[in-house]
Amino acid sequence: MFAEGYIGIAGTIGVGKSTLTQDLAAALNFEAILEEVDGNPYLESFYKDMKGFGTMMQVWLLNHRFRQHREFVTRISLGKIRGVVQDRTIWEDTIFARMLNRHPEKLISDLDYNTYLDLFDNMVLRELVFPQILIYLDCRPETAMERIGLRGRVMEQTITLDYLKMLKENYEEFIAEMEGAGVRILRLSWESFIPIPEVVRLIHEYSLKPSSFTKWVRPLRKPPKMNPKTAEEAKAYAKV
């Protein structure tokens, strides 16, 4: 099921999702839904003991994003807001949980990972709706790396170019599966920023495309192609 007035922004770390989310929401008179990091009670403990807190870190993120998703969909349906533009949808959470599971140190055990996926499925099957349009911002990993450096977030300093390359591969797989299920995907090359009026025009154009939604899709259940080599890299993987 789709929610009219719900636009998702997807893409790797550093591509520019937050900036587009805010600018696009302002242009459409929608509400911007940004990622929240400061309120995570597991964050500090996770960085001290990733294996001990990896599972609960992901469960907290899933629960937080689920509550956020349910609230804004309800507000749209009741006419309290025109719509939302969301920086990283709940559908992408499974990408990062899976990376922790496939880490050489098994930062999330197979048992915990499967329990997490069951929890995700139960939430999705009962409550969640797909965005009207999912905008995928596509850029080279090298470009994303440069942008990460420019914004200077301390917790992102352990991110490597190899990680960004593999993350991009996982995102490409995610987008292909979502598109195969009939979700409208607006793929934008984000090597350079596109003017907001042009993005708005493309959104209106894609909104007229018929939906071919045929089945429920559970993104990214296949084994990942990347095994982070160090615990330091894993800090970056679970962060965003």
Cite the ranges covered by each PLM segment.
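A glycine- and Lys/Arg-enriched "phosphate-lid" helix/loop adjacent to the NTP-binding pocket
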Residues: 95-169
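Hydrophobic positions on the alpha1 helix immediately C-terminal to the Walker A/P-loop
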Residues: 20, 24
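Conserved lysine of the Walker
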Residues: 17
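Conserved substrate/cofactor phosphate-moiety recognition/catalytic segment
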Residues: 26-64
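NTP-dependent small-molecule kinase module
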Residues: 145-240
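P-loop (Walker A) phosphate-binding loop of NTP-binding proteins
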Residues: 12
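A basic- and aromatic-enriched beta-loop-alpha substructure that forms the phosphate/nucleotide-
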Residues: 64-111, 135
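Hydrophobic anchor at the beta1->P-loop junction of P-loop NTPases
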Residues: 9
